[in-house]
UniProtKB/Swiss-Prot annotation:
Binding-site residues for substrate, renumbered to this chain: S252
Protein name: Ketol-acid reductoisomerase (NADP(+))
Cofactor: Mg(2+)
HAMAP family the UniProt entry points to: IlvC
A Pfam family this chain is assigned to: KARI_C
Cofactor binding: number and manner: Binds 2 magnesium ions per subunit.
Length: 340
């Protein structure tokens, strides 16, 4: 089904005007949503547990409260804490302080779609999901445009949930560049699949396997790193700017011919079947339950996965090479320490 892009002109109702807005969490998305909304004239407070984020929110000029206090004061509550802690945060501090007619929002449908969080029937549930990390949501807003966003309504108790979702998207700058309406089911399942099969899981596995093939064949690890990882950004930037067409117009004929000949040998029908199995585990809730259960057990699996990944040869080689390439960005130890 085709969807239609919507813009600021399509946001007809200033549904957030006169509302007290509580942003729960002041991490990557939390700092961006709250600052952008404040800059567009909205009344924003922060709800966060004591710690660095609490101190940072106060430093940035926000009235900052506990999560329970902020919920009690607000008409619209946007939950931007990490997925894995939202359920306990909601049950302990948000749910007891909700009132009929409130609206609760999310930037990802995980906890609502998989029913880890159940909001009372007399409360609106909406979504505004920017398609980019928080630092880009903030930076592009300050530059006069924004990051596109998806919006959705899960529960419309007041009849105003869609207007609230769209006005929220407008308030953070997303409607300047485009909004797409979706559902909680669609956003959640597609987002998880994209992360697991392509953007994160699929991509890192492809890079690591390519690195292993080259080094096991006797090629220098440093050269293998450049061929399978360092140059990835150059190719992805071209695809981002103009699709496969621009990428193929920009590479050599040799590379383009190899693309057509060898790509299908790597991503075979069996790989497609494996991707379908990944999607099935997302759709039936297996992945969600595995993730939440691991968190509740103290994250033994996630910790083990992180330790294993940190010890990959490609990571060690890359860390050394990047020391000689300051042009690639921040130092590894400082990268993305944004509003933690």
């Amino acid at each position: 089904m085709a969807v239609q892009m919507e813009y600021e002109k399509d946001v007809k109702v200033p549904a957030l005007d006169g509302k007290k807005i509580a942003v729960i969490g002041y991490g990557s998305q939390g700092h961006a949503h709250s600052q952008n909304l404040r800059d567009t004239g909205h009344d924003v407070i922060i709800g966060v547990r004591p710690g660095k984020s609490f101190d940072k929110a106060k430093e940035d000029g926000f009235d900052t409260y506990t999560v329970a206090e902020a919920t009690k004061l607000a008409d619209v509550i946007m939950i931007l804490a990490p997925d894995e802690i939202q359920q306990e945060l909601y049950e302990a501090e948000i749910a007891p302080n909700l009132e009929a007619g409130n609206a609760v929002g999310f930037a990802h449908g995980f906890n609502i779609h998989f029913e880890f969080i159940k909001v009372p029937a007399d409360v609106d549930v909406f979504m505004c999901a920017p398609k980019g990390p928080g630092h880009l949501v903030r930076r592009t807003f300050e530059e006069g445009f924004g990051v596109p966003a998806l919006y959705a309504v899960y529960q419309d108790a007041t009849g105003n949930a869609k207007d609230i979702a769209m006005d929220w998207c407008k308030g953070i700058g997303a409607a300047r560049v485009g909004l797409l309406e979706t559902t909680y089911k669609e956003e959640t399942e597609e987002d998880l699949f994209g992360e697991q099969a392509v953007l994160c899981g699929g991509l890192t596995a492809l890079i690591e396997t390519g690195f292993e093939v080259l080094t096991e064949a006797g090629y220098a690890p440093e050269l293998a790193y450049f061929e399978v990882l360092h140059e990835m950004k150059l190719i992805v930037d071209l695809i981002y700017e103009g699709g496969f067409k621009k990428m193929r117009q920009s590479i050599s004929n040799t590379a383009e011919f190899g693309d057509y000949v060898s790509g299908p040998r790597v991503i075979t029908e069996q790989v497609k079947e494996n991707m379908k199995a990944v999607l099935a585990d997302i759709q039936n809730g297996k992945f969600a339950n595995d993730f939440v259960n691991d968190y509740k057990a103290g994250r033994p699996k996630l910790t083990a996965y992180r330790e294993e990944a940190a010890n990959l040869e490609i990571e060690k080689v890359g860390a050394e090479l990047r020391k000689a390439m300051p042009f690639v960005g921040q130092n590894d130890d400082d990268a993305f320490k944004i509003y933690n």
